[in-house]
Amino acid sequence: MKLTINKKQFLQSWSLAERSTSSSSSMNILSSVLVKASFEGVTLQATDIRTSIICTASGVTVVDPGEAVFPIKMVSDLFKKAPGEEFTLDVDDGKVILKAGRSKYNFSTYPVREFPVLPSSKEAKLFCKVSAGELLMVIEEGTLAASTGEEYPLYLSSANFLTSNGILNIVSTDTRRLAMSGVPVFESSDGVNALLPMKGIKEVQRILSSLNSDSPVEILYDDAQFYFRAESLEFTVRRVESRFPAYEKILPKGHQTFVSLDRGNLISALERVDVIVRDYNRMVVLDIVNGEVLVMRGKAPDFGQAMEEISAEISGEDLRIAVNSKFFMEALKVLRDPNVTLAFNGMSGHMAVKRVEKDSF
């Protein structure tokens, strides 16, 4: 196999494959990328067993077709630090010669036969079709409450994907809070739901961020995997073998107090009050009285206290309630809307952070 490579263009594709490898695995083959070259194009394949990717490499001219498995640890640095804008790769019998200007490097590849066969979406069913921008938004909002570590029960570090009536809903929880977001999709299989691990979802987010927001994304599924197809790549995430709790039963109903206000003003005020409480208990108190001002207070013993007044539209019952400033801030910042509605169902109930006049978050 012999390839001529435009470094800048190729590294964009290579970085996608590189992130899907495993740096901690005892199996060297999982810390590698399979390169398959034909005169029709070049594909890159990588996996850490839980996730995998197949993508078309850009910036590559195929002189001689072939395939090889490149170890990530050293090769990635060589690709990135090779001098000039172009270099060549010449692979013969497991040995590679990389030439860039006057520089020349030799290294070995792994056996192609040892590279695992990646999951295939050929027999997979359609889950839904949605634009990259809409999918990125619903993932960011819907996974807000998921735990970042690998916790047990497994659903705590996962997010539930489900389709119903043409809506893709994503839900997550860490038992202290619950996030739910939905978006209309082009096509969908109603009634399908699955748990996906946050590690894989985070990589989907990174991929979506690199795409045009209008780019169509096709999501497919089978009993073991979810497949995300977009432009010239397919990313696969293994499903979590667990069930998400029946969250519908704990959703707050019958709100009695509503506060609508500018999201940016609320975030700024909360950040200032958080300066006082963040090293204590991170609790802020909201004084809500029917009218046009929301009062926010924070207090830390032996340090000080803060009080903010924010213009708002308030309706319903008067209320004083304490909330966690960190959780409150995260919910406000994940929303992209200029305004936000806070809904309450009493002092001992929950607070819901919602879009104004919408139930999509």
Feature map (PLM): residue ranges:
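Structural preference for solvent-exposed beta-strand-turn elements
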Residues: M1-F361
